[in-house]
């Protein structure tokens, strides 16, 4: 069946910001699908609110709209673009929910838009828990006993029948949001209440518990002709009860018999038919009773999912690409397999290796959060590893996580930790076998399949054997590497340096070989160079070429501070080097990303980003240089070791990296260079820290070196706060000094992305943070161009940056953070790499910043590179292109405004206080573009938490009370209902605002929390008292969140707001911006414009000059 010719234009909905449960895998899927549709000649329109994505690059599609993912904005885009079809299966749960809403509201019918890939009734049947259960029963498949409820009372009735524990699953949600396992009435009430809020349908399924059963997933494909294949079987290492996103998973399934697998395969096919699935990829989850073999179907996702990305990378079968082609009418047997070039997509992949996916957690970023894992996902990222055996793949996965510090385990309560899994689950399992627990004992506590536990026991037993051997024992060393032990682990066992192990290995000839991922277990010759290492093989399948080569190091697992933005930069760097004729080798361990798509680079090595693994690849490939500038902190950390081993690091040598990453050295360098820095001191002990803080004067900012995302940074106001921080952080030592800076209160922070070619300097993006100093730039909203800087100040900033870049002799990208106070510019820090704001800046100015930065690294000159994009808008609206006298090339200054807003997953971590500080906690971002700041900010907020236009609650500290009066007064005049606590209400009332007083918690009923839960509050303005809390205090408050003392009153309001999805503003600056957005919304309807239209209009205006 040929492609459909009645369709010309297809609208693709993205998944929005990166958050827990919906991450970079949807950019990978979207980018693949867009490329596939374009290859068939279709026009493609994309709408997404997330600028940090390859799929929103204007070169990729015919029209890209970075707009809020709401029905109103989608309808506006549809009205303007008039697409023939809408493809909703590539944007996660967000896109599916929007597609259903567009259908129900008649928008698709009104504009004659066809839903392709999946039909509305199919989505309803798959996503509505009750409909799904009925459909499965009707086709003879067993499901878990369950009831759909819409109130706590109904849930209590169901539990009387089922008994505890029960699993609560909200409808139409992702990542298990709002769900959980209830073991008693108190937990039931709390989870059901939260689940009803999280569910768009306001229903939850109460399910009879099968905690401890084995969990499996099948990734399947189906076309219009009912051809069906299984792409990959995936087995969860952890049993039912832990969200699959938080579980270690293994592909292919290891403990299924062939009979069980065929039974599961047939069930999957029946399930697709039962819900009327049209064409594309689908993920189906099963549970199997370990003792009886009973099989039940848990749920299905009628779309490309997180597991689809994993299955694609695990097998080499591009699920998203083929899903898009099936959606427009092709059959599986009409789509060629691009890896073999001999088979078609109708051939089921066959793999002769084992893949392990391991989640990456960052619980330390959310003090006070529930640590126990359950049905609500908590991991922020993941890694994938490939080995010839489970043991080897497991070892590679563990080192891919890049965990710098071994967790402190509570071995005295080890059994309790095994029975109640946390993010440290795997460490406790290793510890259990080190402490001689048997497989049966660990199985009884964890319900993990004995096959997996036996494999781990064998690894731990062999570790004991190694401790009795010498490192030069060939047999032991060879077996250790086959079992997945890293050189670093062996060095710790033998009490020698890692370099010593490497030398012994090479001398004894114990080195890895590289095998190809080919979809067919070598049955056909593969054309695509996609490799993994193994010590369980003889033949090397990678053949190095004689071309000029560059090796690009990826960013590893997504984590807070190092997310999709760095993969975006890496992909652009790869394309830039390829354009200049280089063969590009990509090394990365993250299955969610575009960079690990096999057709992005010339060669892909799916390997851990460690010194050991990079050196082994370099030994074979012999690259001309290694690029560490685009992968965040991960590549920078190993640059020294790579350089020491003779590899050439392009653009940044270790000495320069160490100077900029070492807080004390860099601060001293700035001072010696005559550049302004806040007063500071270096402390190597608690005594020195206390003395330094007293000399500088409180408040002070405390910063360790070599951290990303503000890890372990804090602002402290008093001596007791400082002592609390140091004892809690355990970071200070002679080898790990802390920098104590004077905290610049009320300073304006600037984020600057800059590129240098060694001669000229180009400020690509000058961004102003909306919140004042003290909040990490990754968590603060920012605007480009700045809105409050004078011309003189801008000139001063440009001159300062030029001096700094030239004095450090930087070539390539850098990110500089500045603070402006009383018209004085202070340098806060410099990062010798591309920053997380690169994608945002690229979309804001219409120039691919990462590409330009990459080309300067290989000797290209900025003046020539930027000429291609001239004229671009500058502050002076220049018509002639030439460097300024200072050597600073014209800084882009768009005629429109762009705002970046952070997305923080507080809803996933109940009990966490939402107050922001110098340690980053956001996982993603959204972007708003408008003619003025107010419009851009309004769009950014609509993309994030939304904007309320009905009522607000105000409770602020004494210092902020006068500042809020005109802001609240304006909203009151617009018709907002204003609630306030006593002190704030008194000030507002004295200024003529009719305020409704509310009780604080513990002062009377109904109190402020009651009003929030009753839905009477649209948004909240609550500012922190001048006495800031340290992370230790926030942690203690969270653990004691039911106390009624005054200290926890604000905490209770903020946590209630998160639970009830009420936007909560915690700074005056953000409130001021929110009011400007509300004013703009009241004034007129917000427009929608594609990036192509924006850039074309701006360039046209300039050319007319």
Curated annotation (Swiss-Prot):
UniProt keyword Ligase present: yes
**Known EC number(s)?**
6.3.4.16, 6.3.5.5
**Residues involved in Mg(2+) 2 binding:** 299, 301
Quote the cellular component terms of the Gene Ontology held in the record: cytoplasm
List this protein's GO terms for biological process. 'de novo' UMP biosynthetic process; glutamine metabolic process; L-arginine biosynthetic process
Where do the record's region annotations for Allosteric domain lie? 946-1105
The record lists Mg(2+) 1 as bound by: 285, 299
**First-tier enzyme category under EC:** ligase
State the needed cofactors, names only: Mg(2+); Mn(2+)
**UniProt cofactor note:** Binds 4 Mg(2+) or Mn(2+) ions per subunit.
Region: Carbamoyl phosphate synthetic domain, residue numbers? 543-945
Which region ranges are annotated with the description Oligomerization domain?
403-542
Instruction: Cite the InterPro entries for this sequence.
Output: ATP-grasp, ATP_grasp_subdomain_1, CarbamoylP_synth_lsu, CarbamoylP_synth_lsu_oligo, CarbamoylP_synth_lsu_oligo_sf, CbamoylP_synth_lsu-like_ATP-bd, CbamoylP_synth_lsu_CPSase_dom, MGS-like_dom
Superkingdom is Bacteria
Which residues does the annotation say bind ATP 2?
A: 703, 742, 744, 749, 774-777, 817, 829
Please state the pathway this protein functions in, per its UniProt record: Amino-acid biosynthesis; L-arginine biosynthesis; carbamoyl phosphate from bicarbonate: step 1/1; Pyrimidine metabolism; UMP biosynthesis via de novo pathway; (S)-dihydroorotate from bicarbonate: step 1/3
Q: Where does Mn(2+) 3 bind?
A: 817, 829
- Protein residues bound to Mg(2+) 4: 829, 831
Q: What are the binding positions for ATP 1 in this chain?
A: 129, 169, 175-176, 208, 210, 215, 241-243, 285, 299
| Residue ranges of every copy of the ATP-grasp domain listed in the record | 133-328, 667-858
- Family indicated by similarity: Belongs to the CarB family.
Domain text:
The large subunit is composed of 2 ATP-grasp domains that are involved in binding the 2 ATP molecules needed for carbamoyl phosphate synthesis. The N-terminal ATP-grasp domain (referred to as the carboxyphosphate synthetic component) catalyzes the ATP-dependent phosphorylation of hydrogencarbonate to carboxyphosphate and the subsequent nucleophilic attack by ammonia to form a carbamate intermediate.
Role description: Large subunit of the glutamine-dependent carbamoyl phosphate synthetase (CPSase). CPSase catalyzes the formation of carbamoyl phosphate from the ammonia moiety of glutamine, carbonate, and phosphate donated by ATP, constituting the first step of 2 biosynthetic pathways, one leading to arginine and/or urea and the other to pyrimidine nucleotides.
What is the protein's given name?
Carbamoyl phosphate synthase large chain
Question: Corresponding gene?
Answer: carB
């Amino acid at each position: 069946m040929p492609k459909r010719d009645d369709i010309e234009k297809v609208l693709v909905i993205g998944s929005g910001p990166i958050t827990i449960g919906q991450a970079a895998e949807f950019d990978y899927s979207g980018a693949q699908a867009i490329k596939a549709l374009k290859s068939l000649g279709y026009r493609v329109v994309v709408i997404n609110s997330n600028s940090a994505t390859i799929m929103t690059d204007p070169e990729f599609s015919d029209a890209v709209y970075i707009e809020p993912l709401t029905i109103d904005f989608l309808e506006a885009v549809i009205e303007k673009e008039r697409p023939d079809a809408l493809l909703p299966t590539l944007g996660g749960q967000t896109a599916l929910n929007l597609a259903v809403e567009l259908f129900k509201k008649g928008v698709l019918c009104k504009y004659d838009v066809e839903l392709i890939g999946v039909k509305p009734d199919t989505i309803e049947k798959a996503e509505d828990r009750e409909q799904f259960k009925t459909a499965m029963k009707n086709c003879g498949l067993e499901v878990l006993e369950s009831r759909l409820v819409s109130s706590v009372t109904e849930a209590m009735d169901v539990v009387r029948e089922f008994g505890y524990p029960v699993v609560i699953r909200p409808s139409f949600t992702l990542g298990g949001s709002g769900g959980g396992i209830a073991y008693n009435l108190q937990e039931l009430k709390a989870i059901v209440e939260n689940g009803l809020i999280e569910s768009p349908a306001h229903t939850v399924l109460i399910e009879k518990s099968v905690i401890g059963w084995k969990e499996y997933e099948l990734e399947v494909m189906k076309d219009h002709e009912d051809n069906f294949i299984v792409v990959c079987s995936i087995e969860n290492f952890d049993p039912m009860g832990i969200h699959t996103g938080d579980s270690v998973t293994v592909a292919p399934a290891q403990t299924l018999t062939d009979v069980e697998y065929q039974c599961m395969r047939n069930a999957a096919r029946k399930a697709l038919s039962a819900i009327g699935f049209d064409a594309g990829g689908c993920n189906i989850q099963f549970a199997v009773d370990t003792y009886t073999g009973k099989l039940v179907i848990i749920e299905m996702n009628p779309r490309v999912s997180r597991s689809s990305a994993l299955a694609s990378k695990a097998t080499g079968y591009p699920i998203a690409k083929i899903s898009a082609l099936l959606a427009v009418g092709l059959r599986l047997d009409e789509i060629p397999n691009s890896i073999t070039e001999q088979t078609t997509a109708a051939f089921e992949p066959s793999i002769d290796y084992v893949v392990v996916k391991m989640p990456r957690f960052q619980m330390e970023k959310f003090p006070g959060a529930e640590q126990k894992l359950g049905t609500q996902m908590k991991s922020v990222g993941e890694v994938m590893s490939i080995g010839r055996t489970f043991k080897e793949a497991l070892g590679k996965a563990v080192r891919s996580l890049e965990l710098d510090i071994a967790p402190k385990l509570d071995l005295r309560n080890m059994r309790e930790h095994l029975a109640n899994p946390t993010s440290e689950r795997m460490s406790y399992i290793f510890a259990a076998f080190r402490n001689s627990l048997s497989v049966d004992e660990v199985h009884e506590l964890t319900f993990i399949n004995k096959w997996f536990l036996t494999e781990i026991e064998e690894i731990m037993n062999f570790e004991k054997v190694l401790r009795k051997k010498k490192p030069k024992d060939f047999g032991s060393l060879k077996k250790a590497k086959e079992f997945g032990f890293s050189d670093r682990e062996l060095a710790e066992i033998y009490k020698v340096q890692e370099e010593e192990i490497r030398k012994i290995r090479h001398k004894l000839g114990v080195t890895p070989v590289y095998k190809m991922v080919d979809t067919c277990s070598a049955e056909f010759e593969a054309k695509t160079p996609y490799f993994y290492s193994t010590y369980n093989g003889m033949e090397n399948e990678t053949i190095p070429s004689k071309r000029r080569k560059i090796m690009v190091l990826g960013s590893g697992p997504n984590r807070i501070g190092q997310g999709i933005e760095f993969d975006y930069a890496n992909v652009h760097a790869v394309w830039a080097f390829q354009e200049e004729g280089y063969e590009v080798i990509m090394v990365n361990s993250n299955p969610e990303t575009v960079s690990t798509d096999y057709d992005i680079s010339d060669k892909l090595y799916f390997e851990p980003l460690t010194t050991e693994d990079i050196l082994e690849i370099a030994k074979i490939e012999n690259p001309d240089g290694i690029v560490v500038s685009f992968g965040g902190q991960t590549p920078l950390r190993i640059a020294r070791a790579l350089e020491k081993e003779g590899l050439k690091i392009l653009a940044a040598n270790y000495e320069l990296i160490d100077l900029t990453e070492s807080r004390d050295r860099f601060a001293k360098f700035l001072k010696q260079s005559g550049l302004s820095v806040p007063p500071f001191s270096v402390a190597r002990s608690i005594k020195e820290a206390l003395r330094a803080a007293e000399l500088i004067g409180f408040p002070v900012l405390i910063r360790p070196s070599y951290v990303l995302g503000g890890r372990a940074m804090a602002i402290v106001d008093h001596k007791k706060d400082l002592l609390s921080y140091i004892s809690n952080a355990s970071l200070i030592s002679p080898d790990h000094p802390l920098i104590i800076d004077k905290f610049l209160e009320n300073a304006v922070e600037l984020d600057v992305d800059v590129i240098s070619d060694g001669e000229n300097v180009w400020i690509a993006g000058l961004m102003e943070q909306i919140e004042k100093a003290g909040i990490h730039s990754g968590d603060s909203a920012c605007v480009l161009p700045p809105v409050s800087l004078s011309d003189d100040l801008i000139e001063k900033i440009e001159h300062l940056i030029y001096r700094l870049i030239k004095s450090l002799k930087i070539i390539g990208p850098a990110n500089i953070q500045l603070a402006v106070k009383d018209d004085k510019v202070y340098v806060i820090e410099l990062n010798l790499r591309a920053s997380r704001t690169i994608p945002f800046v690229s979309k804001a100015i219409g120039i691919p910043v990462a590409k330009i930065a990459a080309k300067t690294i290989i000797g290209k000159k900025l003046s020539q590179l930027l000429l291609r994009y001239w004229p671009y808008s500058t502050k002076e609206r220049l018509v002639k292109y030439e460097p300024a006298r200072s050597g600073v090339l014209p800084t882009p200054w768009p005629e429109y405004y762009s705002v970046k807003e952070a997305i923080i997953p507080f809803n996933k971590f109940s009990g966490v206080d939402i107050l922001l500080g110098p340690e980053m906690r956001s996982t993603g971002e959204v972007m708003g573009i408008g003619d003025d700041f107010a419009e851009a900010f309004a769009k950014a907020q609509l993309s994030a938490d939304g904007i309320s236009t009905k009522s607000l609650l105000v409770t602020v500290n004494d210092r902020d009370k006068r500042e809020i009066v005109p802001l609240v007064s304006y909203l009151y005049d617009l018709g907002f209902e204003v609630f306030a606590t006593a002190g704030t209400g008194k000030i507002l009332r004295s200024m003529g605002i009719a305020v409704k007083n509310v009780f604080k918690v513990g002062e009377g009923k109904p109190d402020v929390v009651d009003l929030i839960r009753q839905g009477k509050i649209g948004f909240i303005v609550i500012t922190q008292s001048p006495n800031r809390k340290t992370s230790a205090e926030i942690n203690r408050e969270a653990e004691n969140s039911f106390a009624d003392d005054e200290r926890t009153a604000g905490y209770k309001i903020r946590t209630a707001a998160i639970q009830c999805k009420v936007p909560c503003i915690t700074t005056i600056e953000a409130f001021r911006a929110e009011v400007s957005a509300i004013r703009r919304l009241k004034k007129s309807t917000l427009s929608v414009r594609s990036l192509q239209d924006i850039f074309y209009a701006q360039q046209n205006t300039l050319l007319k000059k």
